[in-house]
């Protein structure tokens, strides 16, 4: 992870800069007033990764200055959740005098939750053995005895040792309703838990008066699908990454939601299926008849590269488009196409990444009369 100047005194100032930047960027699209969703000023990141430095008997976390590439010691990290900060010193202290746990350890990854669970991945430049497993189990027990709800994973080249499980269970509150999410180590999850809740509430609010079914592309672990299911008859969602699809299936079952169907395919493949260019056996195998769906609304949350032109054209076929973007530059490019047929009726900034230039935006588009 790189340098981050977490300064609560500067929070409103950096947010105002983003508001101005985003408003100016999208002025040509005749957007409505920007809805702004703030982050906690510190302890907002649910994930953090640190390199580990060995100095004689000492062992500590380090980060690198982005400009100078100089390393510096990190004992606390105000951007990370309180849970991560509470665990950081205890973890390193417990490993310092243990040869099996510290030898060739080069990185520690933390994945925490609002629900209180935390997962630690220990990364090594050596193969791990039975002795490591025994020591890691003792470490886990010791820290859980101190009040943590912790799991540990050991990683080395072509090696992954899971002591109990490689995921955490997160609980996000959406308008007073709690949703359960399995979040697997090394797969994508929203990094800012409190802002993730606000994004879900905004999406639910935008689709309140919906009719028919929802189509969702790039659904990840079902983050939005589950919360949006209440506003639609059925939800058909696609995702390419296998671990995310498996988590989405887990989450559908855990939340007892019966109107969401997830298919493992890319947005590009789905576009071909919708246009009848190709038949996909996995649609048949999953009992999915695309013609039976009555989707007036499409929800997209693409990667940083945005949507390709063909997917944009396919998306234009829907009455309403909800688009969550982690890269306003590519959202702008996509809006050049989408605004030919649709107007932006809602416009939001979610401050997922305070004190950085990154912005997360949301738009609702409705077909022009």
Curated annotation (Swiss-Prot):
EC number(s) given by UniProt: 2.1.1.-, 2.1.1.35
Active site: 326 (nucleophile), 360 (proton acceptor)
Top-level EC class: transferase
Any Gene Ontology biological process: tRNA methylation
Catalyses which reaction(s): uridine(54) in tRNA + S-adenosyl-L-methionine = 5-methyluridine(54) in tRNA + S-adenosyl-L-homocysteine + H(+); uridine(341) in tmRNA + S-adenosyl-L-methionine = 5-methyluridine(341) in tmRNA + S-adenosyl-L-homocysteine + H(+)
Swiss-Prot/TrEMBL keywords: Methyltransferase, S-adenosyl-L-methionine, Transferase, tRNA processing
Residues involved in S-adenosyl-L-methionine binding: 190, 218, 223, 239, 301
SUPFAM superfamilies xrefs: S-adenosyl-L-methionine-dependent methyltransferases
Cellular component GO terms, alphabetical: cytosol
GO MF assignments: rRNA binding; tRNA (uracil(54)-C5)-methyltransferase activity, S-adenosyl methionine-dependent; tRNA binding
NCBIfam families per the UniProt record, alphabetical: trmA_only
Job description of the protein: Dual-specificity methyltransferase that catalyzes the formation of 5-methyluridine at position 54 (m5U54) in all tRNAs, and that of position 341 (m5U341) in tmRNA (transfer-mRNA).
PANTHER family tied to this protein: TRNA/TMRNA (URACIL-C(5))-METHYLTRANSFERASE, TRNA_TMRNA (URACIL-C(5))-METHYLTRANSFERASE
HAMAP family in alphabetical order: RNA_methyltr_TrmA
Family the UniProt entry places it in: Belongs to the class I-like SAM-binding methyltransferase superfamily. RNA M5U methyltransferase family. TrmA subfamily.
Name used for this protein in its record: tRNA/tmRNA (uracil-C(5))-methyltransferase
Organism: Vibrio parahaemolyticus serotype O3:K6 (strain RIMD 2210633)
Gene this protein is translated from: trmA
């Amino acid at each position: 992870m790189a340098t981050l100047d977490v300064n609560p005194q500067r929070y409103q100032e950096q947010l105002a800069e983003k508001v101005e930047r985003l408003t100016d960027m999208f002025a040509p699209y005749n957007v409505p007033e920007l809805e702004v969703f703030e982050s906690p000023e510190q302890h907002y990141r649910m994930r953090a990764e640190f390199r580990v430095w060995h100095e004689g008997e000492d062992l500590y976390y380090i980060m690198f200055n982005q400009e100078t590439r100089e390393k510096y010691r990190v004992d606390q990290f105000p951007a990370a959740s309180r849970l991560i900060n509470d665990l950081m010193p205890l973890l390193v202290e417990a490993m310092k005098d243990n040869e099996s746990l510290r030898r060739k350890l080069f990185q520690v990854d933390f994945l925490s939750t609002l629900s209180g669970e935390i997962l630690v991945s220990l990364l090594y430049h050596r193969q791990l053995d039975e002795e490591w497993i025994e020591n890691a189990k003792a470490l886990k027990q010791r820290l859980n005895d101190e009040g943590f709800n912790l799991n540990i994973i050991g990683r080395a080249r072509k090696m992954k040792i899971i002591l109990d499980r490689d995921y955490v269970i997160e609980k996000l509150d959406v308008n007073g309703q709690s949703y359960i999410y399995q979040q697997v180590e090394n797969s994508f999850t929203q990094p800012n838990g409190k802002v993730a809740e606000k994004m879900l509430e905004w999406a639910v609010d935008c689709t309140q008066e919906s009719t028919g079914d929802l189509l969702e592309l790039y659904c990840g672990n079902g983050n939005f699908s589950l919360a949006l299911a209440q506003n639609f008859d059925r939800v058909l969602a696609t995702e390419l990454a296998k671990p995310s699809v498996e988590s989405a299936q887990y989450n559908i079952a855990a939340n007892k939601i019966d109107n969401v169907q997830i298919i493992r395919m890319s947005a590009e493949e789905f576009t071909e299926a919708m246009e009848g260019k190709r038949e996909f056996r996995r649609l048949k195998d999953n009992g999915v008849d695309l013609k039976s769906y009555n989707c007036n609304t499409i929800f997209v949350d693409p990667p940083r590269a945005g949507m390709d032109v063909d997917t944009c054209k396919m998306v234009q076929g829907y009455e309403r488009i909800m688009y969550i973007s982690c890269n306003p530059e590519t959202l702008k490019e996509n809006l050049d196409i989408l605004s030919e047929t649709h107007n932006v009726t809602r416009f939001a900034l979610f401050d997922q990444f305070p004190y950085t230039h990154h912005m997360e935006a949301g738009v609702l588009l409705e077909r022009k009369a």
